[in-house]
Amino acid sequence: MPELPEVETVRRGLQPAMEGFRIDRAVAHRENLRFPLQKDFVARLTGQTVTGLGRRAKYLLADLSSGDVLLMHLGMSGSFRVVEADGETRPGEFHYPRSEDRTHDHVVFEMASGARVVFNDPRRFGFMKVFPRSEIETEPHLKGLGPEPLGNAFDASLLAKACAGKQTSLKAALLDQRVVAGLGNIYVCEALFRAHLSPKRKASTLANRKDEPTDHAVRLTEAIREVLGEAIKAGGSSLRDHRQTSGELGYFQHAFKVYDREGEPCPTCGGTVQRFVQNGRSTFWCPKCQK
């Protein structure tokens, strides 16, 4: 599933095609995605101008001139492409594998510029929803999300307080969207490696007895920001179904230090990268230098 860097890359790719333009026509070729599209989905989009295109965690959020918000989630295999008025596909700046099978083109936005923004999703785990901007604080998919890891509010103190007293593993805590929004398995593994912290370590060790941040929390916060920032700059990770809107493959996976590198030498200490299953997911780490 695309994580924060992939979704942010998609947002940046769609922004020049959607932001500031009117949706002349919305077409739903298939209404039963992960969740059924609302009966008034097409009507609430048609004729509205996209006044802003943002992101919250792994969700894309398009503000509409009507006061509504269009929430979009890529799911496991969802992708966007932009077909310009001249018929040439120039989907933006991002990298993520998308299906070439047009039978999976489920939703199309025909923009006033003449461009067509097409959502393709073979597995249909993605979804879209329109709701009033006034309800954004209570929207079930957004309610309770933690801070954005690249936002100004996210720092070692905030992370330490969120993890204080937690007896769960550090990796499990970071994957909890209530603790930090948008982090997924790939970048948690990479951030823990950079911070030299074991994924098995208790989350509570990020805070001292006064719930103040320990050195572990400081190192981890910096590592999270670095890993995410580098991944966004590289265009995200092209694993399985992820690609940029331009159709180009991303290349951040080539910078992975431990993820999907089981049995390879650790680039830091020369030890061996190992894999084990943690909370139903593969964890990659170096037991020698992650403590």
Swiss-Prot record:
List of catalytic residues: P2, E3, K58, R281
Keyword Hydrolase: yes
Cofactor binding remark: Binds 1 zinc ion per subunit.
Record CDD domains: EcFpg-like_N
ZnF FPG-type: positions: 257-291
Family matches, as Pfam families: Fapy_DNA_glyco, H2TH, zf-FPG_IleRS
Residues given in the record as DNA binding sites: H104, R123, K166
Gene Ontology biological process terms, A to Z: base-excision repair
InterPro entries per the UniProt record, alphabetical: DNA_glyclase/AP_lyase_DNA-bd, DNA_glyclase_Znf_dom_DNA_BS, Formamido-pyr_DNA_Glyclase, FPG_cat, MutM-like_N-ter, Ribosomal_uS13-like_H2TH, Znf_DNA_glyclase/AP_lyase, Znf_FPG/IleRS
Obligatory cofactor(s): Zn(2+)
UniProt-listed Enzyme Commission number(s): 3.2.2.23, 4.2.99.18
Keyword field: DNA damage, DNA repair, DNA-binding, Glycosidase, Hydrolase, Lyase, Metal-binding, Multifunctional enzyme, Zinc, Zinc-finger
Superkingdom to which the source organism belongs: Bacteria
Record PANTHER family: FORMAMIDOPYRIMIDINE-DNA GLYCOSYLASE
Protein name as annotated: Formamidopyrimidine-DNA glycosylase
Native species: Rhodopseudomonas palustris (strain ATCC BAA-98 / CGA009)
Gene: mutM
